[in-house]
UniProtKB/Swiss-Prot annotation:
F-type ATPases have 2 components, F(1) - the catalytic core - and F(0) - the membrane proton channel. F(1) has five subunits: alpha(3), beta(3), gamma(1), delta(1), epsilon(1). F(0) has three main subunits: a(1), b(2) and c(10-14). The alpha and beta chains form an alternating ring which encloses part of the gamma chain. F(1) is attached to F(0) by a central stalk formed by the gamma and epsilon chains, while a peripheral stalk is formed by the delta and b chains. It holds the Pfam family ATP-synt_C. It is a multi-pass membrane protein. GO terms for cellular component: plasma membrane; proton-transporting ATP synthase complex; proton-transporting two-sector ATPase complex, proton-transporting domain. Its main location: membrane. The chain crosses the membrane at residues 11-31, 53-73. Belongs to the ATPase C chain family. F(1)F(0) ATP synthase produces ATP from ADP in the presence of a proton or sodium gradient. F-type ATPases consist of two structural domains, F(1) containing the extramembraneous catalytic core and F(0) containing the membrane proton channel, linked together by a central stalk and a peripheral stalk. During catalysis, ATP synthesis in the catalytic domain of F(1) is coupled via a rotary mechanism of the central stalk subunits to proton translocation. It is found in: Cell inner membrane. It comes from the Bacteria. GO terms for molecular function: lipid binding; proton-transporting ATP synthase activity, rotational mechanism. This is ATP synthase subunit c.
Amino acid sequence: MENLSMDLLYMAAAIMMGLAAIGAAIGIGILGGKFLEGAARQPDLIPLLRTQFFIVMGLVDAIPMIAVGLGLYVMFAVA
């Protein structure tokens, strides 16, 4: 029975990391599309848009990194 709980912990960590990666990929895709749309509408604002784009992209990308850290913690420290 102990082996089943270990398998469930590994599965939970894998699902957590996978869903975080999928969510970040979708978010960055939408963000990139909106950046290109804004740059096409007002080309003179590209430097401002680029700065905001990279700041928000870093924040969106931080969520999967936190999930990977928590997943590895669950896999190696808790289990």
